[in-house]
């Protein structure tokens, strides 16, 4: 169903903007706090000539969801998520099959949203696990990655809090309040 020649109602607004050079939709995206999404959507408009062209964006989104699943596997492993290999394999599959994530794969206009979740995860990992970088570099890089994630779609940027929860609360290690404080500063 993902790789078919169909479009949802919002996909047609993208189609309309692409074929009639209607920039109000781009302006709306920027004004609603999604400037990177607006830029990506503007670039994407150059590739849309008909409904079957939405397939390309669904493929990009599905590949992003697959990448998200792989990232989640390695993140859960590093965070020592309880349940071992079985939990590390099953949990990413279940999370990537949530209706909202599945919608990102089916709805062409949502093509960068799964990437936004990946950016939030990369932000969290950079802040807490890139020990080769100096602390200030990790902090700045993390803030930039999270800002990019929010600039695509704010709700997916909030996935930073999910990574924070998994790493700090859903494992057998003790809470590290300094780490939690840094995480809260970045997300604030």
Q: What label would you give each PLM region?
A:
Residues 2-5, 44-49, 77, 97-107, ...:
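Juxtamembrane "helix-exit" motif on the non-cytosolic side of transmembrane helices
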Residues 28-55, 59:
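Short hydrophobic/aromatic helix or loop-helix immediately within or flanking a transmembrane segment
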Residues 138-154, 159-160, 165:
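Membrane-interface alpha helices of multi-pass inner-membrane proteins
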């Amino acid at each position: 169903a993902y790789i078919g020649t169909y479009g949802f109602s919002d996909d047609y607004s993208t189609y309309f903007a692409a074929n009639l050079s209607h920039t109000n939709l781009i302006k709306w995206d920027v004004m609603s706090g999604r400037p990177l999404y607006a830029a990506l959507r503007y670039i994407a408009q150059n590739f849309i000539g008909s409904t079957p062209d939405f397939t390309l964006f669904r493929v990009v989104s599905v590949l992003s969801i697959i990448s998200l699943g792989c990232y989640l596997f390695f993140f859960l492993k590093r965070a020592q998520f309880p349940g071992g290999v079985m939990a590390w394999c099953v949990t990413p599959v279940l999370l990537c099959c949530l209706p909202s994530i599945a919608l990102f794969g089916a709805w062409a206009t949502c093509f960068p949203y799964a990437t936004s979740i990946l950016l939030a995860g990369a932000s969290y990992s950079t802040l807490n696990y890139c020990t080769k970088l100096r602390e200030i570099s990790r902090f700045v890089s993390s803030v930039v990655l999270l800002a990019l994630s929010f600039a695509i779609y704010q709700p997916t940027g909030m996935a930073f809090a999910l990574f924070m929860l998994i790493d700090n609360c859903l494992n057998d290690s003790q809470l590290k309040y300094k780490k939690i404080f840094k995480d809260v500063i970045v997300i604030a």
